[in-house]
Amino acid sequence: MIENWPKKPEGSQWTDDQWKAVVANGRDILVAAAAGSGKTAVLVERIIKKIINEENPVDVDRLLVVTFTNAAAQEMKNRIGEALEKVLIDEPGSQHIRKQLSLLNKASISTIHSFCLQVIRGYYYMLDVDPRFRIANQTENELLKEEVLDDILEEEYGIEDNTIFFELVDRYTSDRSDDDLQRMILALHTESRAHPNPEKWLDKLVEAYDVEGKTIEDLVYASYLLEDVKFQLETAEQHIRKATELAMLPDGPAPRVETLQADLALLGTLSSAARESWTSVYEAMQNVSWQTLKRIKKSDYNEDVVKQVDSLRNKAKDEVKKLQEELFSRKPESFLRDFQDMHPVLEKLVQLVKVFTERFQAMKRDKGMVDFTDLEHFCLQILSEQSEEGEMKPSAVALQYRNKFAEVLVDEYQDTNFVQESIIKFVTKDSESEGNLFMVGDVKQSIYRFRLAEPGLFLGKYKRFTQEGLGGGMKIDLAKNFRSRHEVLAGTNFIFKQIMGEEVGEIDYDADAELKLGASYPEGEDVAAELLCIQQTEEEVIDGEEGAEVEKAQLEARLMAQRIKAMVDSGYEVYDRKTDSMRPVQYRDFVILLRSMPWAPQIMEELKLQGIPVYADLATGYFEATEVNIMMNVFRVIDNPMQDIPLAAVLRSPIVGLNDEELATLRAHGKKGSFYEVMSSFLKGAPLEEEKELHDKLEWFYNLLQGWREFARQQSLSDLIWKVYGETGYYDFVGGLPAGKQRQANLRVLYDRARQYEATSFRGLFRFLRFIERILERGDDMGTARALGEQEDVVRIMTIHKSKGLEFPVVFVAGLGRRFNTQDLMKRFLLHKDFGFGSQFIDPRKRIKYTTLSQLAIKRKMKMELIAEEMRVLYVALTRAKEKLILIGTVKDATKEMEKWLDAREHSEWLLPDHIRAGASCYLDWIAPSLYRHRDSEILLELGQGSVPDEIYGYDTSWKVEVVDGNTLLAPEPVQEEKQELLEALREKKAVPLESERKEEVYDRLMWKYGYEEATSHRAKQSVTEIKRNYQSEEGSDNAFIKKLRAPIRTRPRFMEKKGLTYAERGTAVHAVMQHVDLKKPITEEVIREQIAGMVNKELLTFEQAEEIAIEKVISFFDSDLGKRVLAAKSVEREVPFTMMLAAEEAYQDWQGQSGESILVQGVIDCMIEEEDGITLIDFKTDTIEGKFPGGFDQAKPILEERYKVQLSLYAKALEKSLQHPVKEKCLYFFDGNHVIKVEE
C-alpha cells in the first residue's frame, strides 16, 4: 500500500513525482510523462529497484518490458546492465546481482512484435503455421495481396447472375478499371486487422446499415452529427453575441440590436431542437427566417464597426445555411432509405474482404511467411479463447504468463493499438485496483494514428485513474522538463494553453499538463522564442500552386540559412552540459524540422549555397539517381531488349557511349522495327568506313547483352548485377565522377536490394523489375544511400516524427504555413474504427450521387481526429528545443491572414473558441492567433490589447514576432564589412595590399575578361511571359534583375493593403475552367456550374477561386462568333505546352553578345483550333477594361494589342515550327466586355 512505499532518500535528485513513479505499486499505474521529463530514467530506476528489493527481489526475466522500437529496447537493456554493474561494485559478493546480469540477455525487454514472436515460437503447435516461418518483406506482401485479389475478382466476374457484385462494381469503380474496388477491399482488410476480432468488426460494419424498424434517432451517425450541429449553432451564437456587443458601443449601429436579439432567439430555438432529436432540428430548420436589417444612415455611425457587425451576422447566417444544405435539406426518412439500399452491396463487399483475408492467409501459410499484423493476431490467438458468451477470455497459456510476470511495463503507451492492448491485458492481472501493469507515455506526443495507434486508450485510463489510486488505477504526472530553457517551455505552454482542449484536441492542457521548468541554464543572450511570418513575394507565380510551394520553400530556406550563418559567425553561445560552460554554437547544434520532406532538397540546396554543411535522410530520390536509373534500364533491356526507350537510354549512356548523331544513324538503318531489331540487322552487314566506330561500340555491347541474357536464365539476380558492374566497368566509372562515393554506394544498395528480393518467395529478373515498379507505384522510393554520418558537424533536416525523442540546442520549425494534409477526407469512401464505412450514395442507373449520413459523420470525426493529431505533432516539434526555438511560416497575403488571426484578441478566455481552433488549416492558424494575444506581438502594440485579459497579455514568456517581406530575402546579404575594401579594389582592378611571388600571374588572371560576358547577364531559359515583360520593361531585359541581386534593398511589408484573390489567381482559375469545359455538352449555366463543382471536388480549384468565376462570362465567350468557331472546329487543343529554341536577339531587345546565341523558351498556349482553312490561335485574358480606359474599348484596343503582340507572335512561331503549318489568325479574347482583338504582325 501507499504507506509502505520506500521514502525518498535525503539529497535525492528525483522529484517527488518521479520518486512516486519509481516506487508506487499494488495497482495499475499510468505515468503521464511530459516531454523531457526523464521517463526513461524513471523506468530504468523502477526496474532496478524491483530487482534489488531486499524484501521481495524480482528476477529480471520475470519482468516484461515493452518498448516502441528495437533501439529503445537495446538502450533499456544497456542502461539496466550498467546500473546492475554499479550495484555489483558496491556489493561484489551478491550472487543475486550476478544472476540478473546473466539473465539480462534472455529478459523480455523488447518491442511488442518481438514478444509476440517469442510467444509464437514457443506455442506454434497451437496454430496452423510452419515453425520455420519468416517475416514477409512489405513489397512482397503487397504483390501477394495483388495476386490474391486479382484471382478473387476474376472468379466473381465469371459467376453468372452475380447481381449484387456487379452492382457493387457499378457503384464503386470507373469504366477503365476496378482499382477503386480493390482499394476498398484492401483498406477494409487493413482496418479490420487493427481490431482484436477482425470478423466481428466487419460484421458490425454491415449491421450498422441494417436499419429495418429503426428511426434516424437510433443511428450512431445522427447522434454524433447532432453534437456537431450544437457546436456550429454555438459558433453562430458567439458571432451574434459579439455583433451585439459592437452594436451597443457608443459609435455602434444601435438600431441593429433589435434584429440581433431576434437572431439570438432564432438560434436559441434551433439549439433547443438540437438537444431534443434530429427530427426536431429538421423541422426547426424548415422554418428558419432571418429578419431583414433596418436601414441606417451609415454616416451616423462608425463605418468600420457597422461592417464588423454585418460581417459577424453574415458569418452566423452562413453557419446555419451550411447546416441546412449539408444535413437538413433532406427528410430524415430519405437518409434511412440510403442505408437500406446500400446494405446488400456493403454486405457483398464485406464478404469479399473475408474471402480475401482467408485466401491471403492461406497463401502466406503456403509460402511459410507472416507479416507484422499476423504476429499480433497469432499471439492473441494463443493467449485467448472464446467464452460461452462469445467474448474473448485468457487462455491457459495467458494464465501461465500472468503467473510468470511480476510486472508488465509498457513504454510509449500512447502509441498502443487495440490488438496490442488486448495482448497486454491477457498477460497482466485482471483488476486495475490490484493490477501489475505500469504504463509510461505522453498522449500529447501520440503522433502515429496513421499506423493505427489509438491515443484513446491512454486518454480513457487517464480520465479514469486517480492520483491517489483509490478504488482503481493510479495516475502520476511527470510535468517537470529537464531539457529546455524557461523561454522554450513558457512559449510552448503559452501556445498550447490556448489551442489544446478536450473538445478540439482530445485533451485539456491544464495545470497538470503544463511543462514545468526542471533544468538550470546560465543566463543567455537572445534566447527568446521567435515567430517569423514571411509575406510571399508579389511576383506572379507562373507555375501555379506547385510554383508557389517552391517559392515558399526557397524563401524559408533563405531566411534559415541567413540566421544559421549569422548565429555561427557571431559566436552565438549554447550551454554544454559536459563542460558545464557556454560555448560557441556549431552546425550540429541546429535542426530544421518539417512536417514532411518535400521541401528538404530545396532547403539543402539553399544552405549549401551559403556554405552551410547540411544532412537529411531523404526517403526519396534513389531510383531517380542517374547511375541507378541507367542500371535499371540495363536490366530492363536484359529482360526484354525489344523495349525502345530503355535500350536507347543504355545506348546513349556512358556504358555504350553513342552520341545523338550515332543514335540517329542507327535508326536510319531501319525506320521500321524496334531499336534492337535495327541493331541486330546493322551488325550483320559490313559497316561503311565512317560507321566503323559505331559498329564496334554496338558489337561490344551486343555480345555482352547476349551473355547477360543467357546468364540471367541460369544464375542468381545478385550475381548478374555484379557481373554487369564488372564487365561494363560502370561501377568504377561512377566512382570517378563528382560524389563518386555516393554513386557507388547507390549501386551497392541496388545489389543489396536484389539479394533481399531473392530471399523472398519470388525469383527472376522479370519479377524483380515488377517488384521495383510496385515500390515506385506505392510511392515507396528509398533515399539515396547514406554517405555522411549523422554525427558530423552538419545542420540536420528531418521530419517532426523522426525527431521524436531527440533534442537540439537550436530548433527551426519550418513550413508552418503549409496546409494540413486532408486528402484522406476526400476519398471516395471513408473508414473509421467506431463508425465503420461511409461513402456517397451512388445510383448508376439514374446517374446520381450524393452525400450520406455515415459519410458526413465519419468525415467530421476524422477531421477532428486529424486536428488533434496535428496539435500533438506541433507539440512534439516545439518540445525538441533546448535553448532557442524559431518558428517560420509563409503566407500569400499577410494582411488577409492577420485580419483572421486578430479575431483572437476579442476573446477573454485562455482557451480560444472551438471554431477558431477547429477551423485551422495550418499550424500558423494556431500559433499566430495565440501570439497576437501577447504583449511581445508588435501588431498588438499597434492595434491595442482588445479584450485580452492581463493574465494572457502579460504572460511570463518572451517572444519575437516579425513579418518578413519575401522580396528582401531574394537579395543576398551585404558583403562583410572587413572584406569590403579588398573587394572594391579588386572590382576596380586596383592593386591590392598583398605581396606574392605570383603577383603577375594573379594580376593577369584578375584582368582576364570572359568572352561571353553578355550571356551571363541574360537567362538561358525564359518563359514567354517573361519575354513579354522584358519588351514592356524600360530596362529591356532581366539584366536588371541580376543587378538588383547585387544591391539588396529592404522595404517594409505592405501589411495594410487589403486583398482578396490576386489578379493572377483569378486568371489562373478562369483558365482552368476554360481548359476543362466539356465542348460536347451544351454550354449552359447548369453545366458550367456542375463542372466547377467537380473541379473543386478534385482540388483543381479552391472554393475561393470557384466563387470568383463569372459563369455568365464563360457562356458569353461561347455565344460569341469566336466561341462558336471553337465549338464547330475540326479539332480543339487547350493548354498546349511547348519548348523551342529562339535567337537571343529576338528575346532580348538589348542583346549585344555574339550572334548565333540561342535561348530556350517555354510557354503554354491557351487554345488552338484547326478549321478547314488553317489554324487559329486564341489567348484568353482577364485584364480589366471596363472603367479603366476613359475612351472605352477603342482606346484600350491599340494598347492591349501592343502589350500582347510579342507573346502571341512567339506562340504562333512555336505552333508553326511544331506543326509545320502556318497560323492563319492570332486572337486575344477579353472576358471583361466580351472583346476580341485580332493581332497582326
Curated annotation (Swiss-Prot):
Keyword ATP-binding in annotation: yes
InterPro entries reported for this sequence: AddA (IPR014152), DNA_helicase_UvrD-like_C (IPR014017), DNA_helicase_UvrD/REP (IPR000212), P-loop_NTPase (IPR027417), PDDEXK-like_dom_sf (IPR011604), PDDEXK_AddAB-type (IPR038726), Restrct_endonuc-II-like (IPR011335), UvrD-like_ATP-bd (IPR014016)
Cofactor: Mg(2+)
Pfam family, one: PDDEXK_1
Annotated family: Belongs to the helicase family. AddA subfamily.
Highest taxon of the lineage: Bacteria
Reactions accelerated catalytically: Couples ATP hydrolysis with the unwinding of duplex DNA by translocating in the 3'-5' direction; ATP + H2O = ADP + phosphate + H(+)
Protein name in the entry: ATP-dependent helicase/nuclease subunit A
Biological process annotations from GO: double-strand break repair via homologous recombination
Domain UvrD-like helicase ATP-binding, first and last residues per copy: 12-485
Enzyme Commission designation: 3.1.-.-, 5.6.2.4
Complex and partners: Heterodimer of AddA and AddB/RexB.
Positions bound to ATP: A33, A34, A35, G36, S37, G38, K39, T40
